[in-house]
């Protein structure tokens, strides 16, 4: 009988979250939709497609009013990379927000987790995390790519 990998628990761990200044939206499109021209890249640009719908997380500045969307959201990225075997990261970070009745939209990328909170609740979310021992800092400035 083969042993399954042991998961590392995030219980009691503290994390550093980077807060991004850009305002994002979460838009819903019909299943099989092409990526529309208005879906601008942003700090976080994510496309999730299922058999029933397509969700896009993108910059909010160009989304047409007729498109079903929610936002604006402020993005917080958990400093990573996070090991795939690590468990409880989102629980440790989302439980304080649930207790404070702050809604979230979570997105995971290969190296880390992103937590989007309504922009009007971003300061409250940061304060809840700090109370639990987590660190919230402004996002590092990305290096400019040279041609």
Predicted feature descriptions by range:
Residues 100-115, 121, 142-145:
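A cross-kingdom feature marking solvent-exposed beta-strand/loop segments within repeated
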Residues 1-96, 100, 124-147:
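Regulatory modules associated with amino-acid/nitrogen control
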Residues 53-58, 112-118:
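A generic structural motif
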């Amino acid at each position: 009988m083969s042993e399954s990998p042991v998961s590392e628990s995030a219980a009691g761990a503290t994390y550093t979250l980077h807060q991004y200044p850009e305002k994002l939206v979460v838009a819903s499109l019909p299943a099989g939709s092409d990526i529309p021209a208005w879906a601008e890249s942003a700090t976080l640009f994510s496309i999730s497609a299922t058999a029933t719908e397509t969700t896009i997380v993108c910059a909010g500045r160009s989304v047409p009013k007729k498109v079903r969307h929610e936002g604006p959201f402020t993005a917080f990225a958990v400093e990573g990379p996070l090991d795939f075997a690590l468990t409880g990261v989102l629980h440790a970070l989302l439980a304080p927000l649930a207790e404070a009745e702050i809604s979230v939209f979570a997105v995971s990328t290969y190296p880390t987790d992103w937590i989007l909170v309504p922009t009007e609740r971003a300061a409250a979310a940061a304060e809840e995390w700090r109370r639990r021992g987590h660190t919230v800092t402004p996002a590092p400035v990305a290096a400019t790519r040279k041609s």
